[in-house]
Amino acid sequence: MLGKKAYKVIGMILAMMLVAGCGAAADETAEPELLLGFSQIGSESAWRIGNTHDIERAAEDYGVSLMFENANQSQENQIDAIRRFIAYKVDVIAFSPIVEDGWDNVLMEAKEAGIPVILVDRDIKTDIEGLTTCLIGADFYNEGVMAAEYLIRKADELGLESVNIVEITGTENSTPMRQRQAGFADTIAGDERMHILESIDGDFLKSRGAECMRYLLDTYGDEIDVVFSHNDEMTLGALPEIENSGFVPGKDIIIISIDAGQEAIDVLKEGRINCVVECTPNLGDELMETALKLKNGEEVEAVIHPVEQAFTDEMDVDSIEPRGY
């Protein structure tokens, strides 16, 4: 039999092993695998809020430490945030640029610091190679194409010989504004029935969507056959203005939107919107996976686009599943 001294020795050894094990576990959790600095444009829409929530959720799922900055619609705030990330020596920087131009200086600072940069949702314009490593986001050009393709089918269905369109665009010089506009315009260019009466900047805001629609109705009235709006928030702002002017959206005026948030899908089901092109905000998993690859020195794809679709009055709209944003 073991004596009391032997039991004490064994107990001490077991206790030391337990402490050592706990210490190792603490060490493993103390240092996250990745420190990611992310600058978000703002919280101007349900889409943007959903995008933020998905990135925060993914960071937690992947064990990534997230430094989050809300720019509140200001490029200056975003540039300041990126400089803070550089000073803090994060492993990777990611941001959704509010506009395409004006990033060269701060991104050169990140490059000189050896910090890779990922673009999320939107692209930038630059003549300097190597400032960013990857773009994760929707194919905005194709969203414009899908919107135009629906309109052409709808015009065929209704037998329209002439189609007058007003366009409420997103923030001027932003990637989605430019590419959605280009995709739409290029697709209808070969159809002589299609005429864009005016394009006006709605800044992706519900309030601006209402203001733009009031102006367009005052200017063109019953000449308007179609409203093509670059996001759901502006569309939802425009609808009451259309109704207050005595028109029935979805019937008197064809309504085409982009984002496919839950509120817009509900209005599609009511028949007040005809087409909503999807632009998913759920980019968190792709962002975390890409950032981890960069931290580990792995190659990443230059562009990552999620698969998207259009929801239209041509389909069984009641079968559309909850959107989550």
Language model features with spans:
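Hinge/cleft segment of the Venus flytrap/periplasmic-binding protein
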Residues: 32-34, 168-172, 176, 187-188, ...
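Extracytoplasmic "Venus flytrap"
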Residues: 35-58, 62, 66-80, 84, ...
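Hydrophobic alpha-helical segments within soluble ligand-binding/sensing domains
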Residues: 36, 78, 135-162, 208-210, ...
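Short, solvent-exposed amphipathic alpha-helices that sit
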Residues: 47-62, 143-150, 175-194, 208, ...
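Short beta-strand elements at the ligand-binding edges of bilobed clamshell
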Residues: 68-70, 126-153, 167, 199, ...
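Hydrophobic alpha-helical
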Residues: 92-112, 184, 198, 202-266
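Flexible loop/hinge segments that line or gate small-molecule binding clefts
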Residues: 105-142, 261-269, 315
